[in-house]
A protein has these predicted regions:
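Interfacial aromatic "cap" segments that immediately flank transmembrane helices
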Residues: 2-37, 115-142, 176, 189-238, ...
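Alpha-helical transmembrane segments in multi-pass membrane proteins
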Residues: 40, 44, 51-97
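Membrane-helix interface motif
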Residues: 40-63, 143-161, 241-260
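Selective recognition of hydrophobic, aromatic-rich stretches within alpha-helical transmembrane segments
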Residues: 41, 78-112, 167-205, 239, ...
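Short, highly charged, low-complexity non-transmembrane loops/tails of multi-pass membrane proteins
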Residues: 60, 258-259, 308-319
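Short, membrane-exposed interhelical loops at transmembrane-helix boundaries
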Residues: 69-76, 258-284
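Short, charge-rich, low-complexity alpha-helical interaction segments
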Residues: 131, 135-182
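Membrane-interface interhelical connector segments
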Residues: 160-169, 202, 206-210, 255-274
Length: 319
């Protein structure tokens, strides 16, 4: 099986953003909208009760009243809020499946059509299924690896105890460090071995989770290097944008709003008042987040489509 170029794969996401900026923007909006649906539904159905319960709780605390007063109403309201978590999980899987399929379609099957390469069909169903099953399987593997690491770590610790100091102390410290590193490395390795499942499933239109193990054989180290590059890139982009956001926030003279007294006074207002004041910031951050989610998702996922295309010698789009 062919090898792949880390540089070519790493640049695939940036290249796709440059070639299809409006598509990437649309993907971000769709991704954010789908993830926002359960939140909007929750506020529509539970929002008034939640604001009322929250207001009563804050008012009681401000008046130095009984800490338990209002807690029952608040707890009941929050239990209703938690019922939307399952719906949020499903819409998150749906959003990820749709956007992943759009990215893979732009990379591997550009003539497949769809609005901005977006569709809802069997490709998206397969992506959702592979995402769900892979997540469950990796979680099971991770638990087993952690349990094995705990057992090995325990053996090393008691071996160090038996040897006694000072050598025993070194055995315990170095042994436990090595065990933690081995545990983390094994989990990362498992994730990398399954990293071709999504693009392979999209390309073949069949469930390719376990076939990914064969596709990634002999490519673990290059995949690790690629994953590290992508991780550092995502963190760097988020860090720069975070600093820029704080710079804008401070330049507008809003630094005083972060003082403890200002924060306490802000939330001491009626919930509908402070929500109204915060709404422009929430909307602004949401819009920026929509744009960024499409870009970051593309930068993260397109490289794996490129890796798949290179190792299977599948044509990939460059237009």
């Amino acid at each position: 099986m062919a090898s792949f170029s880390i540089g070519e794969a790493y640049g695939a996401g940036f290249g796709l953003v440059a070639r299809k900026p409006f598509q990437v923007l649309t993907w971000g909006i769709v991704y954010s909208a789908l993830n926002l649906l359960p939140v909007l539904l929750m506020f529509w159905l539970v929002g008034p009760d939640m604001i009322k319960a929250w207001g009563e709780l804050i008012a009681n605390a401000a008046a130095n009243g009984d800490p338990e007063a209002g807690m029952e109403s608040y707890t009941q309201t929050m239990s209703r809020v938690q019922s939307f978590q399952a719906l949020g999980g499903l819409t998150s899987i749906l959003a990820t499946a749709i956007i992943n399929a759009a990215i893979f379609r732009a990379m591997l099957r550009p003539s497949d059509g769809g609005f901005m390469h977006l569709k809802v069909g069997m490709d998206e169903l397969w992506q959702g299924l592979i995402y769900l099953v892979a997540g469950i399987l990796i979680a099971i593997f991770a638990v087993l690896v952690v349990l094995a690491s705990v057992a090995i770590g325990g053996i090393v610790y008691f071996a160090g105890e038996a040897v006694g100091s000072p050598l025993g102390g070194w055995i315990k410290v170095l042994g436990l460090i090595a065990t933690v590193i081995a545990c983390f490395t094994t989990i990362v390795w498992i994730c990398l071995r399954f990293s071709m499942a999504a693009p392979a499933t999209f390309d073949t239109r069949t469930f390719q989770l376990f076939e990914s193990w064969s596709l990634t054989k002999g490519h673990s180290l290059p995949l690790l290097a690629l994953a590290l590059l992508l991780g550092v890139t995502i963190i760097a982009i988020q860090g720069v944008l975070g600093v820029a956001f704080l710079g804008i926030f401070f330049s507008l003279g809003s630094i005083e709003a972060l003082s403890p007294d200002s924060i306490e006074a802000f939330f001491a207002q009626a919930p509908d008042v402070w929500l109204g004041q915060a709404a422009p910031w929430i909307i602004g951050v949401g819009l920026i987040g929509s744009v960024l989610s499409g870009i970051l998702h593309t930068i993260l996922m397109a490289p794996f489509a490129s890796v798949y295309a290179q190792i299977t010698e599948t044509p990939q789009s460059v237009a």
